[in-house]
Amino acid sequence: MSTKVENILEELKSLNLLEAAELVKQIEETFDVDASAASGGVMMAAPSSAPAASDVEEKTEFDVVLEEVPAPKKIAVLKVVRSLTGLGLKEAKDLVESAPKTLKEGASKDDAEAMKKQLEDAGATVGVK
């Protein structure tokens, strides 16, 4: 692997969840692509190439579930959901109003806890499973 690619990879590893979401959004806009379509193929390829690694991942992957949003806190939670997921206003509003709803699947423990803290600070009830 070239030095340039290694440097980019190291920079990507240092991004937090919000920065990664922003990066994905910018890549989608710049290159006119849809990251959600590409992630399906990557997810299917990973288990076949490293079945031993998937056992380890299962123990470290968590789902962040938006359990409940009190009416007075809906706008604050909506803003946090938009920043965490990169969703548009309507999509984020629909998600918040349809709680309980899974926001993120397969998140690392640190990312899941960070998301939970931000959502709880905004007034939502959040579960990490």
From Swiss-Prot:
Main location, first listed in the record: plastid
Alphabetic keyword roster: Chloroplast, Plastid, Ribonucleoprotein, Ribosomal protein
GO MF: mRNA binding; structural constituent of ribosome
Compartment annotation: Plastid, Chloroplast
GO biological process, one term: translation
Gene Ontology CC: one annotated term: chloroplast
Subunit structure: Homodimer. Part of the ribosomal stalk of the 50S ribosomal subunit. Forms a multimeric L10(L12)X complex, where L10 forms an elongated spine to which 2 to 4 L12 dimers bind in a sequential fashion. Binds GTP-bound translation factors.
Record function comment: Forms part of the ribosomal stalk which helps the ribosome interact with GTP-bound translation factors. Is thus essential for accurate translation.
Family the UniProt entry places it in: Belongs to the bacterial ribosomal protein bL12 family.
Identification of the protein by name: Large ribosomal subunit protein bL12c
Organism expressing this protein natively: Porphyra purpurea (Red seaweed)
Annotated gene: rpl12
